[in-house]
Amino acid sequence: TDNIYWIALGVDSPILRYHMENNQLEESFPVKGRATELSIINVQDLKAIGPYIWMGTRAAGLYRYHTQTHELKHFGSEEKSPEQFLPSNHVSTLYTDASENLWIGTYGGGIGLYNNIKESFTIYNEENGLPNNAINSIVADNNGKLWVSTLKGMSCFDPKSETFTNWDNKNGYSLLETNLHACLKSSSNIFYVGGNNHFLSFNPQLIRRNTFIPPVYITKMRIWADYLEDNKAAQWVNISNQRIKLRYNQTSFTIKFSALSYVFASNNKFSYMLEGFDKGWS
C-alpha cells in the first residue's frame, strides 16, 4: 500500500513494514486498542484491500488493520453473533478476487467469504460439496472460478452457482497432498500446483467434465427362500430378462447391479428404492 510492503515473518516475529521510497524497515507501527495482541500472533498470510491490511493467523483468527486510522479489528470462530463466525481460527490462506472480495481458507473449517457491508461471513465446507475442510490455497482463473487446493484433492468453485467440482486421484488429479500456498496462475491462465510427491500444471479451459450418465442394469439375483427350502447356500442367478416373477414366499432376495461404463467408474453414485416398501430414494 502506497509503496509500503508488509512482511510477516512467522512465529514469535513482528510484522514488518518496508518503505520503498526511503529504504526503511519498521518493526513497529501505531495500533489502537490491540497493539499487544498484534505483537504475539503468528501471521500465515497478508492481503491488502483498499485502506485495510488483512492478517490471517495460525490460531487467533483474522485481523483487519486500517492503515489510516490505525484501528485493529478481530474476527474469530468464537464471536457471539453467528454470522460473524469464522469457520476456524486457523487461517491458512487469504485470496482477493477481481471484485476485491476476500476469501479466507482455513485448516478444518473450509472457506469463508467476507461480506464487507454486513461484516459477516458466508461459509463453504464439506457439507456444501468441498472435498476437504483443510485449505492450502485459493486462486481464481480467468473466468472467475476459484480453484481450491485441499488435503484431499483440488476443487473448482463457481461463485455464481455456489457449486463445487472436485478432482482427486480417482479422476486424474495425481497429487497426493498439496503444500501450503503452492499454487500459481501464470499470465496465460496455466495453473501450477505443488505437492508432497511432485507438481503438476493444467489449463482450466481445456478441462472437460464427464457428464455421461451410464445406464444401470441389475446383473444378478439371489433368492434367500431357496436357501431355506433346500438347506443349501443360495446361488447367484444371472439376470437376462426384463421381468422376473417370484413366488409368494420369495420375499427376501439380494441383487447385484452395475453401471455400464468404465470411465472413472469408482466415482459413480447410485440411489435405490423398492416401490411399495421404501418411501423415497436412498
Where are these regions (language model features)?
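Residue-level detector of Asp-centered blade-edge/turn motifs that repeat once per structural unit
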Residues: 1-2, 47-51, 96-99, 140-144, ...
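Beta-propeller domains
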Residues: 41-44, 49, 56-63, 83, ...
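Sequence-structural signature of mature extracellular/luminal beta-sheet repeat domains
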Residues: 1-5, 12-17, 44-53
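Residue-level "micro-hotspots" composed of small/polar
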Residues: 35-42, 79-92, 122, 126-139, ...
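Fold-core signature of tandem repeat domains
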Residues: 25, 72, 102, 121-124, ...
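Conserved beta-propeller blade signature
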Residues: 4-8, 52-56, 101-105, 145-148, ...
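Loop/turn residues immediately N-terminal
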Residues: 11-15, 58-62, 107-111, 151-155, ...
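Short loop/turn segments that connect beta-strands within beta-propeller blades
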Residues: 19-23, 66-70, 115-119, 158-162, ...
